[in-house]
Every structure is written in structure tokens, then in C-alpha cells.
Amino acid sequence: MLSVNLASLPIVEEMISRKEDLNIEVIKLENGATVLDCGVNVMGSFEAGKLFTKICLGGLAHVGISISGSLDNKLVLPCVKIKTSHPAIATLGSQKAGWSVSVGKYFAMGSGPARALAMMPKATYEEIDYRDEADVAILCLESSQLPDENVADHVAEKCGVDVSKVYLLVAPTASMVGAVQISGRVVENGTYKMLEALHFDVRKVKFAAGIAPVAPVIGDDLKMMGATNDMVLYGGRTFYYVKSDEGDDIENLCKSLPSCSAETYGKPFLDVFKEANYDFYKIDKGMFAPAIVTINDLRTGKLMSYGETNVDVIKKSLKFSQL
């Protein structure tokens, strides 16, 4: 059985050894846990964002960053590229932000390998039939505050490991690393919607790849939450190899997956969030999806695609001006 924590550990160790090059800080807590500050009190970097994203994906994906090859002159943004041969485990078993870490006054959304030890949430792991077994716990936290010993103790207890084997990576939404890792969820947005909204068995997805633009740092965490989500919803493009069973309606799956199927499509995410009174649970689940979905059905040989990118909404979200 693949271990997302053990697969991610060498990447964590690489980040620690390259901390100056990556513009990150490594902090050893008094209880022995290790914190990697990737953007709270440091600048971070694209390379740190790439490695952070690989860890979010449980070490089971290739991650790259480049400038888009498009020459349409509409908008030039860096892009993050993802590909994985283990889509269900990498995206839902690791990358999904499925752990609300709340300890005292500290709160962060947790994603990454440690979730597969703590089974956060249990239903997801039952759906994909996966659980990790490892003596090390690696958790990625989206927060503008660094965790303390109490948070590390909490994670260690939930994961059943010694606190000295806990690694906590932290990046605010409003940071370079934060922007990269959120755009790096482009494939996961699709598998999440497959499972949570369309109730499709994601274990049938055998390979997945995606690309999404990376938001520039344009403001505080709230503004960046809107911008980073828009990168995927209006700029994300994905490709899934699916081995269907007879009776699976893959054409309907493909049509239902992209963000354009949501009622709120066409508005910047921050506007939708405000209209929902800042309550994620009031937002149409269908909105959390890539802009374009392409599926190759390995059983039938059919290739199909649905959706479209929307540069105008991205420009509006970023308050972009062409000089």
C-alpha cells in the first residue's frame, strides 16, 4: 500500500535542507515537532510553492510551474501544472482541505498526508478505500499564523504518532506559496466534484493532469481567497483518463463537471462568497470545479471535452489593467 506520509517525507527534508534557497524558515518547537514557515514571516518562492504542493498531493504527483505558452496577449500569468497516476489517493486522500484544525485560538484548514492517518474526514477514506500507515505525520496548513506546541500535540494525537515526528507546513492564502498550492488543486477540484456532488466512483479515474494560472498577490487573505479560487474556476484545464463500467454515463459526467454548470458561474468567487454571507456551505458545490474538463474513456475509447476558460472574469477578479 502506498504511504502518502512516507512518500512526502523526502520532499519535506529537501525543503529543510534548502530553506535559504527557498526563502522559508524552519522552526523546531519545544516538544520536538517541526514547523516550516512558507509565507507567514517569510517571502517564500515559486519553488517552495511547487514542493509544498507536491507534499499536499502526498508525494504522488509531478508539479511544475511555468509561464503559459499561450500567445493571445490577453493576460500573462504563471501556471502550475499537475499530473498524477494516483488521482483518488493524491487528491482526495491527501490534498483535499478536509481537516479543520482548531486548537484554542488557533485555526487553519489542513490538507496533505497527515489526513490519511487521522482519517479526516472518515467518509472520504471509506469512499476511496484508503488509509495510510506511517510513523510520521505531515500536515499542510493554510493560515496566517504559525502553530504552537498545542497544535502539534493535537495533530500527533489524532495521527497516532510521536510529536517529534510531526511536520507542519504553513502558508497564508495571501502569499506566493499559498497562491501556488491553491491553483495546484485544479485536478482535485474535479475529483472532489465527481465524488461529492456527482457521486461518481473516483477510483475509476486512472490518471489525471491539469493546469491553472497562479494568482498574483493582490491583497489580504480574503481578497486572495477570491482570486485564487477564480484561477481554477475560470482558468483551470483538466484531463482525466477514466476506466468506466458499462452503464456509466461519462458524457453526462463530463458535461456536469466544469464550473460553467453552476448557477453562479460568471461572477468572481469573492462576489459569490459575499452573496452567501461568507458561508461556504451556502455556495453551490458545483462551482468548485475546473473551467474545462476533458475525459478519455478507456473502456470505449471516446474522447470528450466540456467547458471554457473565462479570461474576462479573471481580469475582473484581479482588477487587471492593460497599460
Swiss-Prot record:
Its EC number is 3.5.4.27. Its main location: cytoplasm. Keywords: Cytoplasm, Hydrolase, Methanogenesis, One-carbon metabolism. It holds the Pfam family MCH. The keyword Hydrolase applies. It catalyses: 5,10-methenyl-5,6,7,8-tetrahydromethanopterin + H2O = N(5)-formyl-5,6,7,8-tetrahydromethanopterin + H(+). HAMAP family: McH. Belongs to the MCH family. This is Methenyltetrahydromethanopterin cyclohydrolase. It comes from Methanococcus maripaludis (strain DSM 14266 / JCM 13030 / NBRC 101832 / S2 / LL). The gene is mch.
